């Protein structure tokens, strides 16, 4: 919605333009009227719509044609004033003023026009019969107001309607010739209806209608008012009410009726509550609310975000089988301009028999939020998070983690989403490693484009963590501008071709050797015979020299089954980033924790025994 309104008054000389402005400001008819009033600004707190309003007068004797055109170009709405007692001024509306306003304007959309019949005190019968044909001819005319500057009749109403024509314009909503909603308006209202239909039965129950009414207007409908609404719809629209519930056709009819009766601000209130702007597109402020993620921090869905997206899952899981079919996914994404995850099931998560289970669905939301929080905010906006959850914005569903440097200083991370970069030469088995993480066999092929990401949950010390694997070609990290940052690095080499180890070693030395990122070397294709040793340090010797864990064997084929424990180990290393020098052998690490606790207990017992000896010696 516009932040201020600029109203321009035009018309023939002596029709009372200046008198109208001065009567509004002074609340009395001026005895002396200048040729032209100065521009007046009405503060926001004294206007019905709480928007600053600028009122601009025009005088043909004081202003040039160029100055007039400049004022028209700046105006948000034009009030064409005529004298109800002078028919010639009415005819000038059609032949002079409307062509001048919208015939030569270069801005594109037509400027809304309010017809103002002044001096109604001189003609009690009014002039509506004369102006109705003009209103039918020019759709940009919003309304006609008859008033009297002398009697102060309808003065404030005149400027209210002018303000309303800017803030709640009819033209984007309604086609007066076809007497129906414009396509963009119908599309926006259809999306709003689908978001409000919580049980997916293609109709709004009394409970859903009252939730909608409360969200948009701050209070529910009285029971009798609710029945009256449904009665009006059922009398005018076949199928508008079904089983005592309002259908989409009935909902669209109601909004058409509001507009036809001059209450288009009602429809605009609904549209703006659900994020729409003057162009009937979701606004940038709505889709991308302010959310700062400082360097070294990351974004995650919080419990409110997970509750909402799970609620959307359950809403569209119509067969209650715990998974979304392609048709159910299409239903979920029907309120988006396009399917955000592509035409196929995401290849980044676990799927089941061509369906997306809740676990994989939550993983996909987690991945999108971590990689591109702006995109995640957009998706939450399309699903109606701010309105349905009664929050200012969908940023309420996001948590920004503390800086990684603080995690490293404290020796433990509070993050629930961990990034592991799987680095290696081409052909060492990185893609197979990602597929194994998702429980796929070596020969598994995804329906869509393969992804360099995979995400699943792992248990770390009894807590569930989301682990993201990101496949990275080792040679791409050897450039000066490469970004190797992550929570844990998995450096993969082919055990049957040890030349691939040299690349991993180079990446380690360039990016990780002097840092605090935990690293694990992984020897892939462990089912194949070992490669010919090369001059220099062997992988095991290299790891020992750099105080790294011994390379872990991994295979997706042959007699060696994929060891899923490797993924838990990577997540554990990321959770405890201070243990970067091979200290995180699963058994020895927890053994030291236990021994430390035991040592503390023994020390306490010895101290207590010594205390008893000292007491007895006294």
UniProtKB/Swiss-Prot annotation:
Name of the gene: RHOT2
Keyword entries, A-Z: Calcium, GTP-binding, Hydrolase, Isopeptide bond, Magnesium, Membrane, Metal-binding, Mitochondrion, Mitochondrion outer membrane, Nucleotide-binding, Repeat, Transmembrane, Transmembrane helix, Ubl conjugation
A GO cellular component entry from the record: mitochondrial outer membrane
Binding site for Mg(2+) 1: 18, 57
Listed GO biological process terms: cellular homeostasis; mitochondrial outer membrane permeabilization; mitochondrion organization; mitochondrion transport along microtubule
Positions that bind GTP 1: 16-19, 59, 118-119, 121, 149-150
Catalytic activity: GTP + H2O = GDP + phosphate + H(+); ATP + H2O = ADP + phosphate + H(+); UTP + H2O = UDP + phosphate + H(+)
Protein name: Mitochondrial Rho GTPase 2
Record topology, Cytoplasmic segments: 1-592
PANTHER family assigned to the protein according to its UniProt record, in alphabetical order: EF-HAND CALCIUM-BINDING DOMAIN-CONTAINING PROTEIN 7
Domain free text: The Miro 2 domain is necessary for efficient ubiquitination by PRKN.
Domain EF-hand positions: 184-219, 304-339
Family: Belongs to the mitochondrial Rho GTPase family.
């Amino acid at each position: 919605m516009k932040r201020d309104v600029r109203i321009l008054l035009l018309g023939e000389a002596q029709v009372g333009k200046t008198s109208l402005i001065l009567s509004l400001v002074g609340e009395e008819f001026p005895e002396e009227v200048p040729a032209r009033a100065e521009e007046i600004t009405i503060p926001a707190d004294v206007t019905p719509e709480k928007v600053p309003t600028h009122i601009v007068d025009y005088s043909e004797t004081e202003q040039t044609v160029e100055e007039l055109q400049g004022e028209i170009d700046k105006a948000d709405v034009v009030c064409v004033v005529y004298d109800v007692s002078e028919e010639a001024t009415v005819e000038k509306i059609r032949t002079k003023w409307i062509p001048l306003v919208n015939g030569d304007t270069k801005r594109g959309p037509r400027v809304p026009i309010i017809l103002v019949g002044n001096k109604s005190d001189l003609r009690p019968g009014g002039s509506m019969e004369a102006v109705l044909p003009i209103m039918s001819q020019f759709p940009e005319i919003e309304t006609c107001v008859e008033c009297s500057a002398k009697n102060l009749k309808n003065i404030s109403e005149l400027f209210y309607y002018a303000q309303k024509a800017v803030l709640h314009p009819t033209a984007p909503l309604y086609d007066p010739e076809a007497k129906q909603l414009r396509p963009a308006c119908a599309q926006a209202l259809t999306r709003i209806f689908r978001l409000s239909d919580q049980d997916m039965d293609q109709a709004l129950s009394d409970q859903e209608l009252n939730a909608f009414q409360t969200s948009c207007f701050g209070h529910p409908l009285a029971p009798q008012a609710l029945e009256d609404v449904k009665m009006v719809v059922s009398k005018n629209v076949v199928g508008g009410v079904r089983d005592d519930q309002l259908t989409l056709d009935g909902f669209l009819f109601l909004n058409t009726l509001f507009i036809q009766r001059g209450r288009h601000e009602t429809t605009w209130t609904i549209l703006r509550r659900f994020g729409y702007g003057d162009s009937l597109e979701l606004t940038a402020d709505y889709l991308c609310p302010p959310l700062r993620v400082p360097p070294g921090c990351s974004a995650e869905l919080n419990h409110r975000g997970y509750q909402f997206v799970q609620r959307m899952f359950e809403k569209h899981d119509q067969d209650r089988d715990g998974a979304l079919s392609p048709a159910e996914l299409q239903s979920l994404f029907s309120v988006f301009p396009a399917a955000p995850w592509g035409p196929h099931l995401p290849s980044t998560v676990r799927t089941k028999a061509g369906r997306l289970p809740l676990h994989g669905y939550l993983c996909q939301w987690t991945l999108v939020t971590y990689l591109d929080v702006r995109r995640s905010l957009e998706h939450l906006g399309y699903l109606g998070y701010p309105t349905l959850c009664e929050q200012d914005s969908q940023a309420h569903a996001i948590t920004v983690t503390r800086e990684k440097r603080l995690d490293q200083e404290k020796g433990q991370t509070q993050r629930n989403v961990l990034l592991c970069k799987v680095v290696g030469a081409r052909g060492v088995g990185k893609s197979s490693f990602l597929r194994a993480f998702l429980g796929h066999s070596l020969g598994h092929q995804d329906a869509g484009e393969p992804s360099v990401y995979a995400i699943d949950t792992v248990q770390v010390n009894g807590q569930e963590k989301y682990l993201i694997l990101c496949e990275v070609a080792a040679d791409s990290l050897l450039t000066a501008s490469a970004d190797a940052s992550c929570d844990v690095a998995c450096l993969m080499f082919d055990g049957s071709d040890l030349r691939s180890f040299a690349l991993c070693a180079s990446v380690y030395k360039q990016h990780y050797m002097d840092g605090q990122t935990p690293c694990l070397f992984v020897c892939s294709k462990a089912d194949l015979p070992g490669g010919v040793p090369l001059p220099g340090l062997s992988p095991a010797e290299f790891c020992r020299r750099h105080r790294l864990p011994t390379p872990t064997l991994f295979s997706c084929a042959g007699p060696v089954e994929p060891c899923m424990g490797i993924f838990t180990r990577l997540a554990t290393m990321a959770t405890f980033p201070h243990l970067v020098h091979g200290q995180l052998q699963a058994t020895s690490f927890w053994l030291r924790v236990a021994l430390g606790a035991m040592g503390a207990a023994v020390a306490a017992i010895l101290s207590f025994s010594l205390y008893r000896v000292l007491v007895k010696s006294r």
